[in-house]
Amino acid sequence: MIQVLLVTISLAVFPYQGSSVILESGNVNDYEVVYPRKVTALPKGAVQPKYEDAMQYEFKVNGEPVVLHLEKNKGLFSEDYSETHYSPDGREITTYPPVEDHCYYHGRIENDADSTASISACNGLKGHFKLQGEMYLIEPLKLPDSEAHAVFKYENVEKEDEAPKMCGVTQNWESYEPIKKASQSNLTPEQQRYLNAKKYVKLFLVADYIMYLKYGRNLTAVRTRMYDIVNVITPIYHRMNIHVALVGLEIWSNTDKIIVQSSADVTLDLFAKWRATDLLSRKSHDNAQLLTGINFNGPTAGLGYLGGICNTMYSAGIVQDHSKIHHLVAIAMAHEMGHNLGMDHDKDTCTCGTRPCVMAGALSCEASFLFSDCSQKDHREFLIKNMPQCILKKPLKTDVVSPAVCGNYFVEVGEECDCGSPRTCRDPCCDATTCKLRQGAQCAEGLCCDQCRFKGAGTECRAAKDECDMADVCTGRSAECTDRFQRNGQPCKNNNGYCYNGKCPIMADQCIALFGPGATVSQDACFQFNREGNHYGYCRKEQNTKIACEPQDVKCGRLYCFPNSPENKNPCNIYYSPNDEDKGMVLPGTKCADRKACSNGQCVDVTTPY
């Protein structure tokens, strides 16, 4: 039996009320002074790390005892996290700091099922927690030789600017395409699998030169501000089955790389172009957000492209560092990321409970950590229509360049399993303290793993999804269920298509995906537009020039569909977005003639594309 020594760090425990104090969050008119008491369970003789994986604090709020349980946010950083800043002479300096022993936590209040907490424990406790439906902020009072903290409500912070802040997004963005509603029964198997898959957003943050000046030319202060913000964003998106990890941070500590200006529209366009032409070539990521110290025109606090995620030119947003309270800035950033993920502004009928929601057009003074029913529908319909691929990519072991972090749910180099922290792990096969398999276990997860043992050879582990797929079986030597599919070129869907990498791409399904249920393929005459070599019709691009289709290849260019809707009687319709010109082209492997399929904009023998 492991002996456990309960280490308690006790200070004065009596709270008292204060009338007014100037804190990092601003001038607070009504606050309560508390002295958090830390209670930590350590194995006897163990060395206490600087920041434990789990911590517990006790203090009183309004005279009532509160127990705050905290767990390290181990998914906060990606394995290849990097930081870039610039020397006074403009040299780029990029480092890969060890971030596994960070001080950022999520948590809950004991005996309060609806409670939440996002806390930095770097220098005392700083952040917010929800208690009995009320949102409180906590931060150290920074008194000499004292562990005193202030606990207060946001409403008691004096406002620097009474004018409400707004998001600048309107529905006239070129990147926005109206999304037709799709019921569950209309989903293709591929769309359903996509919806069910866990999503990952690799986030890159940039702080402009004014931010650097605002925080006293102190790189650590800017870095801390950014970390605090991401620590709030990650649990907001966890509820949407999206894991947000910070892959990189860049601080423009010498001069701005773009002309940051008070026109939010112009600044967003310039930032997005810089990301596409500069940042992406240096650091792989899915989404970038600029945090700026400039004041945008009017009440605008942020701006983002609607539906821009995974798009080279448009997966970006900008946010003004408009409040001393970091969680309000974090909500603004989560809001702009929401636009990138296909969510529009909430209407009056949208709800997420009693408080304002993340996608409200006006940024609320109240904490908004939930997405409304409308936002969830917007996001779902966006995913069904566009199926952005970058957010499906879970980091691979081979991507890891910094030390593996046991407890972050990612199986990395040197680990056999990773089931989370010792407190949350429920996997009988995995030792959460070492991320190694328990004695006698062959595996911890995988479709060919059953009760910690490999399933027998020949056991079916995945049924065939469709006629282009094959039933997959276990080898008896691995927990993995290797995906196999029918040979390419095999006829499918009543000879309307040919199997291509496990799928049966046919034009009819592609029209439905683009225009909704009821859409059909246009008549052959419509496809003759593909001989013009413009954005309405072409077969492929060479050096950014649209190449017209040859007569025999017209069905391997733009896809022409008939939506078959009361408001659209045009027999020849294409899906066109200037932000993603390739979307709406006939997919590779699609049947274009008898025994022929599309490959690189040409209609070739069915065996050629493979």
UniProtKB/Swiss-Prot annotation:
Motif D/ECD-tripeptide: where in chain: 467-469
Post-translational modification Pyrrolidone carboxylic acid (Glu), affected residues: E190
Gene Ontology CC annotations of this record: extracellular region; plasma membrane
Binding residue positions for Zn(2+): H335, H339, H345
GO-annotated biological processes: apoptotic process; proteolysis
UniProt cofactor(s): Zn(2+)
Activity regulation, short description: Inhibited by EDTA and EGTA, but not by PMSF.
Entry keywords, A to Z: Apoptosis, Calcium, Cell adhesion impairing toxin, Disulfide bond, Fibrinogenolytic toxin, Glycoprotein, Hemorrhagic toxin, Hemostasis impairing toxin, Hydrolase, Metal-binding, Metalloprotease, Protease, Pyrrolidone carboxylic acid, Secreted, Signal, Toxin, Zinc, Zymogen
Binding site for Ca(2+) 1: V405, N408, F410, E412, E415, D418
GO MF annotations in UniProt: identical protein binding; metalloendopeptidase activity; protein homodimerization activity; toxin activity; zinc ion binding
Propeptide: 21-189
Post-translational modification: The N-terminus is blocked.
General function of this protein: Zinc metalloprotease that has fibrinogenolytic and hemorrhagic activities. It induces apoptosis in vascular endothelial cells (VEC), without degrading extracellular matrix (it cannot cleave collagen) or inhibiting adhesion of VEC. VAP1-induced apoptosis is inhibited by antibodies for integrin alpha-3, alpha-6, beta-1 and CD9. Apoptosis is accompanied by severe cell fragmentation, which is controlled by caspases.
The name this protein goes by in its record: Zinc metalloproteinase-disintegrin-like VAP1
